[in-house]
Amino acid sequence: MEAWRCVRRGYGRCVVGRGRYPMLPHHQKSLGRDWTTPWENLQKCCWNRHISSCMRWPGHYSRAPYPYFSSRHFSLNWRPPGLFESRAPFQYWNWRPDSLSQTSLFHLSSYIMNSEGDEPSSKRRKHQGTIQRHWEYICNHNKENTKILGDENVDPICEDSENKFEFSVMSYNILSQDLLEDNSHLYKHCRRPVLHWSFRFPNILKEIKHFDADVLCLQEVQEDHYGTEIRPSLESLGYHCEYKMRTGRKPDGCAICFKHSKFSLLSVNPVEFYRRDVPLLDRDNVGLVLLLQPKIPSATSPAICVANTHLLYNPRRGDIKLTQLAMLLAEISSVAHQKDGRFCPIVMCGDFNSVPGSPLYSFIKEGKLNYEGLAIGKVSGQEQSSRGQRILSIPIWPPNLGISQNCVYEVQQVPKVEKPDGDLTQPELDKTEVLVTAEKLSSNLQHHFSLSSVYSHYLPDTGIPEVTTCHSRSAVTVDYIFYSAEKEGVAEQPGAEVALVGGLKLLARLSLLTEQDLWTVNGLPNENNSSDHLPLLAKFRLEL
């Protein structure tokens, strides 16, 4: 008899062909999620000899949930239960995207074995490694000469300030469980047990405890988990927590948490990007802006403005992303504006769903953007082709949004009122608002902050891109920590026209990794890292 042969098609799917025998029925041709051959034929049709030992029952059951394979009684149209049901069906070894090296030809499904001892040795190695990240200490003696030190000791020349306030900031997209389950196709490479919240949350909390940041900016914080687990756990670690849930029926939001011992809270300012009266703004993303006062017993220090957001993902809606960013910058401008007309230092964190070098990223760093002729799908840099995409309109958002092209709240001119004694007076403007004159239609956007990125996004020695997220479909940088650098640490930017009270000096950052690094531990999430994003972490000094 001529043996069945397998022809590889696509990701993890094999199609069974035949020699001189009739074709199988259509519903029995796929060996993926839809069916499994009888055990005897499965051994014949598979070129990978590990298949005979790869199927096991996870855990210890008093009675197996399904019978073992038999050519007499196994149903060819059997379908496994849902990915996140409480009881697991049989499981197979790991799947990886075709763009990366694979050692086994035959991959059946995303149901992964629990027992690492039963996996092929080439796959077992993935589950034994851990991510190695280290602190990179940075000293800016001047903007032309920046040192990055890879050891555990800070450059002594950096320790030159007597009046200083040092603090650390973490930005972390912790991956909402509901979003994980709604987008399970992004996690085909994962072993199923590592995707359960009961496994993931202890790992996430362990990371937070280990790094012990003074300020946490968290994204994709699921509301029910926040109330029952996340907030109580963080409060027990000495954090004060503020949370803004996404609008509509979205289950998650953004949180900013800070150590009681380091800061006191001056104001909380949530930002909703959904506006019923603006058709463009029909998405439920949010931001959160806090004004924090450093606790320094013997010195007077400026406040610090901390912002956190998660912008829209959709790569083809750059107009919405830019408008959401402008709304966040307008709120930051309002909150950070001091009574003396200057602005306090700013830290802006989040998942911006935009890649380094994209127009949106460049706008944040350079303070200006001319978007005339820019395709809507090119704004975030996630789309490689702009064919069939419309051009950004001028202006991007309508006047009734109340935000100028300088990304500040517009203040309407109030008509002068005549007092009974004949004097003409005008109500005094709120000092936290910025007066903006009427502007002609322009394709130029600006903001008034000198913002730098904590990370350079490429390895200094090789130029290989760093990544902050890595799953079955993508590995790229979308998460950032931006900060208002002291004047000596950043070149003057065209949009930066405001005076700052002090400035932030970047002392150190936790190193990032490459896509290749992450796939050595089977991508994200994995046994030790329970989000599909890496936490970003930076240490700053506020000069007093």
UniProtKB/Swiss-Prot annotation:
GO biological process: 3'-UTR-mediated mRNA stabilization
Segments forming a coiled coil: none
InterPro entries (UniProt xref): ANGEL2_N (IPR045816), CCR4/nocturin_mRNA_transcr (IPR050410), Endo/exonu/phosph_ase_sf (IPR036691), Endo/exonuclease/phosphatase (IPR005135)
Signal peptide (UniProt feature, chain positions): none
GO molecular function, one term: mRNA 3'-UTR binding
Family from the record: Belongs to the CCR4/nocturin family.
Name listed for the protein in its UniProt record: Protein angel homolog 2
